[in-house]
Amino acid sequence: MKVRNLLLLLAFCCLSLAVQAQFVSTSAHPKREFRAAWIQAVNGQFRGIPTDRLKQILINQLNSLQGAGINAVIFQVRPEADALYASQYEPWSRFLTGVQGKAPEPYWDPMQFMIEECHKRSMEFHAWINPYRVKTSLKNELSPIHIYNSHPEWFVTYGDQLYFDPALPESRNHICKVITDIVSRYDVDAIHMDDYFYPYPIKGKDFPDDASFARYGGGFSNKADWRRSNVNILIQKIHETVRGLKPWVKFGVSPFGIYRNQSSDPLGSATNGLQNYDDLYADVLL
């Protein structure tokens, strides 16, 4: 009898542990996981490569990512107010063909190709855009059809680079027009933004937006709060643009790694580096 009772007790304990383990396993993991990888264009890995070879390179990358369990790909399609797709508003990217405005030969649409290949592998496709950046070096030549040539007043030079002025409604409207074009014509799963903040600061040089602040800064006692507001407005407008077109399409943002240092804010991190809030004018906690 004692042996029988002992066996029943052991069986009950094993069953209880199994149920508990199942509960812990289920509760510790979300229903859906986001396991993403970035594929960038600005390192020159695509430039000037023949179409068939580049397609095979991308297929090999996707196969490798699929084998690693990746379920979403964030693919750079607009690095410098240009396009790695058949844009209605901006020129072909130099990071694809070597010359801005030059279409690929033989013709193909890298974004459409990547959407189809990602979906074949049950991966999400996130169209990655850089909103403000136009030139990483003033030596870089712009295509004759680039929007800068029609509206140079929308842009500012900071250091050796060219940017959309984040304060201007015209800048935001153009960026949203580009996103409208992408979301309307392509089966993207998400729009993803990188470098959505003001440019990284250059020592001894303030971002040249005094004229814009004089025109649009009413109601703000200091320029820093106004700049953060400009970034917030763009984020809100893009969110509304995407949701208004296809509510199921996601919208994501990649901020810089430090919100604020604890030396600036108790809510900050134990870091001592560049800060989103103070240096890049992005309030990432909103």
Regions inferred by a protein language model and the residue ranges of each:
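Bacterial N-terminal signal peptides that target proteins for export
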Residues: 1-8
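Glycine-rich, aromatic-flanked loop segments that form ligand/cofactor-binding clefts
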Residues: 32, 36, 70-81, 109-156, ...
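Hydrophobic h-region of N-terminal signal peptides that target proteins for export
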Residues: 11-20
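Aromatic- and acidic-residue-enriched segments that line the glycan-binding/catalytic groove
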Residues: 83-98, 133-159, 195-219, 266-274
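Active-site-adjacent "subsite" loops/lids of carbohydrate-active enzymes
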Residues: 32-34, 40, 44-56, 116, ...
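Active-site neighborhood of glycoside hydrolase catalytic domains
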Residues: 170-286
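The substrate-binding groove and active-site-proximal loops of carbohydrate-active enzymes
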Residues: 42-52, 92-108, 157-176, 218-231, ...
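Catalytic domains of carbohydrate-active enzymes, especially glycoside hydrolases
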Residues: 56-83, 185-190
